[in-house]
Amino acid sequence: FWYPKFGPGQLWETLAADVQAQGAKLQFGHSVKRIVCEGGRVKAVVCDTPQGEQTLEGDIFISSMPVKDLVRGMDAAAPARIRELAAGLPYRDFVTVGLLVPRLGLKNETAMKTLGNIVPDCWIYVQDPRVKLGRIQIFNNWSPYMVKDPEHTVWIGLEYFCAEGDSFWNMPEEECTAFAVSELEKMGVVQKGDVLASHRERVKKAYPAYFDTYEHMDEIVSFLNGFENLYCVGRNGQHRYN
């Protein structure tokens, strides 16, 4: 995979700068609470903002928010069946634990040359039944510019698939990090004493899932397509992983 020099987030930073250069105004710290619909169109969104509740009107609305939240925000504008189907759409959340280490206990046995001769993978999927860990990210291979000293250290991300509010999601950060390190030790990837820094992130609705009410997704799409000025985009906006 090819990533921007400073990681995937740089794509959106560049996009934000470009649209602002064209006169767009970006509102941060706003949370959409209600979508006002009228005559087959979206008329406005009601938001919680640092200045209190505000109503923002527009001609065109592009939504990347989760479909279940979008439909819930429409309230009575959506038929009861559509609200029920959207509320039942499932998601998989995940926790990622980032670790900075001087080396990995994995050998680069390929012909690919890498900085520090680390393994060349962007991701490694974990199939070891002894651990909960699902995937290892190697950020050096996304872009070496994401790491301060890519020749002597490695930033890895450990992905755990879970559900918002479950025991793993709610685990204190220190305990979660210790658990992640112990799993890597079990697999011979790192040693506990090698960890130079760590960081834990929780990601809600990371993956839209294809079960429960998803089999009726076409009904939800048909309903949303009825709004001529509403465009649903992205993974959560379309409840579609790829």
List where the protein language model places each region.
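General small-molecule cofactor/ligand-binding pocket signal
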Residues: 25-27, 196-199, 231
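Mid-domain catalytic core of redox enzymes
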Residues: 30-189, 193, 201, 214-216, ...
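Short Gly/Pro-enriched loop/turn and capping motifs at secondary-structure junctions
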Residues: 163-165, 205-206, 238-239
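Short glycine/threonine-rich loop-to-helix capping motif typified by GTGT followed
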Residues: 205-214
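A conserved FAD-binding loop/helix module that cradles the flavin
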Residues: 234-242
